[in-house]
């Protein structure tokens, strides 16, 4: 939407410079700046502090993974973290390991060594976006990236659990509600959702 429409096939603007400036003035300059500086990449141990801080801001203590748990997760499956940065600031991330087990269990949250790089299912343990950066589609962009990567890696699909109020949100990405999960993580009722390729 922010790219002027009146370009010829070679990408050369057909009108004068003033028209180009006018079109960009109509665009959301803040969105342009965020788009321009956003980076998505996997995690290394150097991201530990930032990841733990975002998690703590996004989830109640009973549900949030600890810094120590994230250290283990990054050690075993850093390539299955999708981190989004605004310049140097971590603003959103998605993570989860890969397994042949079809259902997400509470043990998986606590035992990163269960990761099996050749597994059939990409689990999603957390979808986190800092409150100040919500409602911009950043989490959705990371979910789509996780789906894209899982498909490229020839997984069977992805599995996550969510609260009742988010079923509709995840359904918009193709996840199907399978009902109440056996998970009691954080003493909360969770729905298991699955996207099968």
Located regions from the model:
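Short, Lys/Arg-enriched N-terminal segments with co-localized hydrophobic residues
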Residues: 1-13
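Conserved catalytic-core motifs of GNAT/GCN5-like acyltransferases
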Residues: 23-27, 98-101, 161, 171, ...
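Active-site rim helix/loop that mediates acceptor-substrate recognition in acyltransferases
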Residues: 61-87, 93-114
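Conserved GNAT acetyl-CoA-binding A-motif
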Residues: 143, 150-162
């Amino acid at each position: 939407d922010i790219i002027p429409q009146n370009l010829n096939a070679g990408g050369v603007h057909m009108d004068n410079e003033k028209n180009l400036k006018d079109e960009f003035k109509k665009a959301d300059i803040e969105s342009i700046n965020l788009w321009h500086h956003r980076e998505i990449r996997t995690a290394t141990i150097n991201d530990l502090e930032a990841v733990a801080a975002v998690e703590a801001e996004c989830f109640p203590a009973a549900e949030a993974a600890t810094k120590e748990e994230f250290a283990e997760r990054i050690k075993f499956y850093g390539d299955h973290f999708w981190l989004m940065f605004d310049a140097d600031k971590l603003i959103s991330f998605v993570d989860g390991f890969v397994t042949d087990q079809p259902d997400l269990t509470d043990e998986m949250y606590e035992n990163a060594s269960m990761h099996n790089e050749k597994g059939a299912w990409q689990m999603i343990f957390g979808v986190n976006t800092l409150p100040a950066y919500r409602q911009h589609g950043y989490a959705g962009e990371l979910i789509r990236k996780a789906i894209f990567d899982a498909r490229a890696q020839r997984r069977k699909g992805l599995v996550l659990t969510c609260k009742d109020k988010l079923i509709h949100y995840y359904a918009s990405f193709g996840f199907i509600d399978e009902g109440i999960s056996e998970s009691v993580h954080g003493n909360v009722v969770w729905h298991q959702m699955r996207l099968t390729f």
